[in-house]
Amino acid sequence: LPVNQRTALEQLLFFNVNQHRVRVGIQQSIETYGVPEIHEQDGGLRVRVGDIDGVQTLFAVSDIGRLLGVAVFVRSAHERFAVLHLGVDPRLSMTPELNTRVLLKLMHEIRSTARRTRGVDRIELVYKDRHAVRLHG
């Protein structure tokens, strides 16, 4: 994500008006994995979480370059990815089908990455009481 999108990313991760819907999950993620931080790397923005190595950040960006969503995940055990943080631009909640499409696209990309990663067969959604979804074939 370009550095000039820092404010949009801060709004999405830290000041999202919809955070109250998943407050318990956010607290659980922070207690377990650490606080997310935005940092610059190789001329772009990334999110790191606590002192965990291998945290990956996935951005959903519109055709005109507007940040629509973010997913932060890590390989938490040999066989699973943990989705630590997931956020969508709150303005999209006025258009539920677009909001859902962005969330589904982010999860689809994480699932695709998991399928390409040897040994990973589950995706854990930390916001949903650590619910793990098994990947099939």
Task: Locate the predicted segments by residue.
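Short amphipathic alpha-helix that is part of the acyltransferase structural core
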Residues: 1-42
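Contiguous hydrophobic segments
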Residues: 2-18, 56, 117-137
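Serine/threonine-rich low-complexity intrinsically disordered regions
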Residues: 2-4, 18, 48, 62, ...
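Short linear motifs in intrinsically disordered
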Residues: 4, 46-50, 112-114
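A signal for specific C-terminal beta-sheet/loop modules enriched in small/flexible residues
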Residues: 4-11, 58-63, 73, 82-86, ...
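A conserved beta-strand-loop-helix scaffold within acyl/acetyltransferase catalytic domains
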Residues: 27-32, 36-80
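Acyl-donor binding region in acyl/amide transferases
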Residues: 76-136
